UniProtKB/Swiss-Prot annotation:
Annotated source species: Drosophila melanogaster (Fruit fly)
WD repeats: 180-219, 227-268, 281-321, 330-369, 377-416, 422-467, 470-510
Residue segments, region Disordered: 1-54, 83-165, 544-580, 633-655
The keyword Repeat belongs to this UniProt entry's keyword annotation: yes
Keyword Membrane (UniProt): no
Domain of life: Eukaryota
Record-given protein name: Gastrulation defective protein 1 homolog
Length: 655
């Protein structure tokens, strides 16, 4: 039984012939005539009219043109897609041969490249040979036995392998030294992007280091004293890296921008108010401070007034919250260090009495969330308190020569305590490695020791992984930058050392080492001799060519050329003062004393004799006054030469 093909899109079932329509007798006769003509021609060509020939030629031309256009444009056709044509007989035969589920087995048993060939040649594929499965099972059994037998060996060697891998992770193959000054560097901070570094010392100076702009000489591009005569205790970049928090020995913290210009200075509290929560700021020396982990306008400060204060905003300059630290008896104790955890849900403070106190930022700061009273020796400052990057561990460094590691889930006892870590400065700190597998701290130089060391401890096995000798001075600050993978260590002699790995570290100090320092060429000293040219003399000097506007301005300034009129008569300075003056004293002085001045070069005798004849003829001052009493002038007699100029006056006794 032969079935016709089904075409989808326009579904037609044996519709090659259109449906029968009622025909007239005339149409039937014409069809019969055409069939007889076709049979008579023996299957030859039909006779076409001229119009039919032209239509077919145009159709063929259009088909060729459209096919060429499809090839150029890279498309399959215009308009609707052609309907696919399926053969029903072929589909039925395939359905009989293939059973449900056989295709999946074929795909699993053979690769995809041979599936097409196998489906055409073979209909059924048998199961895989059993030898393959038995080999796999044997291999898996043997491997499992080997793993079980080697478990003990691996467990014994795990610690040594971890220590070796941790030692390789420390970037200290190369070393670069930067000179800050001659005094101890107490503060060290790095930009979050790793482009810059800032340092502060006990000699009040703060230096800015730019790795992209420095050469092998490693000189800072800016040095300033932001807090005048106060040592810099702590520095920290904000989360965005555009501001720097400066904690000094003053009671007021400062915020600087990246270039060192002051943006904010905190308020100072009233020291005569006993309740510290009612003051607007700290009233004693600052000890520590840090930025909020993700809020760029919020930071935390701690001081010796027994409070921690949270500051919000750069414009308001007002504190947001006040946290009081309490000792065991309820008395006030001072916080020596403070810090936020990574998600800013906890604030931790290391106090002078050796206690560790934490507060939840989502609650009121009345009671502590965690409080460990005997965390360190009483009376020794906790110089550093640092959260791990994961936020589950806490490390503290104290002046009691110990460093402790704590777990926040079990906060009563420390996980481990490292001893014999001498620290002389109250800013000595510790830090975690970027993967939280190492804990790093430095020591001050003890007596009888040549060099101070930098220690690396494992946070899992608590063993010493590496010890690096730094210098013959105290090690104060340590900074392990997570992006640069470089270690920065500040020392007590004013130097900052940078350790990096040639392969594991990126940018930072590696950019400066490759740049050679260009020395300035010494300038030759040439004796300066005076050269006089004719054009320099006033006689031969020519005026410079100027524009008409400048010439007019200069002429306007000249009172002669501009024909300035006389200034008004005033008694003040700058005007044409009246000849008689504005007051009686000025009138007397000008008319009687200074109106007729006597020159120093003139002979006074000649000046007087000039008026002698006039005075004798027309006496006005002296002659009329003595005319009645002494009409004849009496002059002094000439004394003999032997007599002294002054004689002793005669008395009545002598007479």
């Amino acid at each position: 039984m032969q079935r016709g093909k089904i075409s989808f899109g326009k579904i037609k079932l044996n519709v090659n012939v259109p449906p029968a329509e009622p025909r007239s007798n005339e149409t039937e006769a014409e069809d019969a005539k055409e069939s007889t003509e076709a049979s008579g021609n023996g299957g030859g060509f039909k006779k076409m009219d001229k119009e039919q020939m032209i239509r077919q030629i145009e159709d063929v031309a259009e088909d060729l043109e459209s096919q060429h256009l499809k090839e150029v444009m890279g498309i399959s056709g215009f308009g609707r897609k052609a309907a696919k044509v399926f053969d029903i007989n072929e589909q039925i035969e395939k359905a009989r041969v293939t059973r449900p589920g056989m295709d999946k087995k074929r795909e699993e048993s053979k690769p995809k490249e041979d599936d097409q060939k196998d489906e055409e040649e073979e209909d059924v594929i048998g199961p895989l040979p059993p030898a393959v499965t038995t080999d796999k099972e044997k291999a898996t059994k043997e491997s499992s036995k080997d793993e079980d037998s080697d478990d003990d060996d691996y467990s014994s060697d795990e610690d040594s392998d971890d220590e070796q891998s941790l030692a390789k992770r420390i970037p200290y193959t190369h070393e670069v030294q930067m000179q800050h000054g001659s005094r101890a560097v107490l503060a060290l901070a790095g930009d979050p992007s790793g482009a810059r570094l800032v340092s502060g010392s006990i000699d009040y100076d703060m230096c800015f280091w730019d790795f992209a702009g420095m050469d092998s000489s490693m000189r800072s591009f800016r040095q300033l004293q932001p807090c005048e005569n106060h040592p810099i205790r702590s520095l920290q970049y904000s989360v965005t890296g555009d501001m720097i928090l400066v904690i000094s020995g003053n009671a007021q913290a400062k915020v600087l921008d990246r270039d060192g210009f002051e943006k904010l200075e905190c308020c100072k509290g009233d020291q005569y108010i006993s309740d510290m929560s009612r003051t607007k700021g700290h009233v004693a020396q600052l000890t520590s401070g840090c930025w909020h982990p993700f809020n760029r306008e919020q930071f935390l400060t701690a001081a010796l007034d027994g409070t921690l204060r949270i500051w919000q905003g750069l414009k308001s300059k007002e504190q947001l919250q006040v946290i009081k630290t309490r000792a065991q008896g309820g008395l006030r104790t001072n916080a020596a260090s403070c810090n936020f955890n990574r998600d800013a849900t906890l604030i931790a403070a290391g106090c002078v009495d050796g206690s560790i106190q934490t507060w939840d930022t989502r609650k009121m700061f009345v009671n502590t969330t965690h409080c460990v009273r005997d965390a360190h020796q009483k009376g020794s400052e906790i110089t550093s308190i640092v959260f791990s990057y994961m936020g589950q561990q806490l490390a503290t460094r104290s002046n009691d020569e110990t460093m402790k590691l704590w777990d926040l889930r079990q906060f009563k006892q420390p996980l481990h305590t490292w001893t014999n870590l001498f620290s002389r400065y109250d800013t000595t700190d510790c830090c975690f490695s970027p993967d939280d597998r190492l804990l790093v701290t430095g020591e001050s130089l003890p007596k009888g020791q040549a060099e101070a060391n930098l220690y690396f401890y494992s946070t899992k096995s608590y063993e010493e992984v590496q010890r690096i000798p730094v210098s013959n001075a105290h090690v104060v600050k340590t900074l392990w930058h997570p992006k640069l993978n470089q270690l920065f260590v500040s020392c007590g002699n004013g130097t900052i050392k940078c350790y990096y790995d040639e392969h594991r570290s990126i940018r930072g100090a590696k950019l400066c080492v490759v740049k050679t320092h260009r020395k300035r060429q010494p300038m030759e000293m040439v004796g300066v001799s005076q050269i006089i040219t004719p054009h320099a003399l006033p006689l031969f000097r020519q005026e410079k060519s100027r524009t008409s506007r400048k010439r007019m301005e200069k002429a306007r300034m000249d009172p002669v050329k501009s024909q300035r009129p006389d200034l008004p008569i005033t008694s003040g300075q700058g005007g044409r003062v009246a000849s008689s003056g504005g007051t009686l004293s000025s009138y007397v002085i000008r008319n009687l004393g200074l109106s007729k001045r006597v020159d120093d070069d003139q002979d006074p005798r000649e000046a007087i004799l000039k008026y002698a004849k006039d005075a004798a003829e027309n006496p006005y001052w002296i002659a009329p006054a003595y005319k009645q009493t002494q009409p004849k002038a009496i002059f002094s007699e000439k004394l003999p030469a032997d007599e002294p100029a002054t004689k002793k006056p005669k008395t009545e006794a002598d007479k």
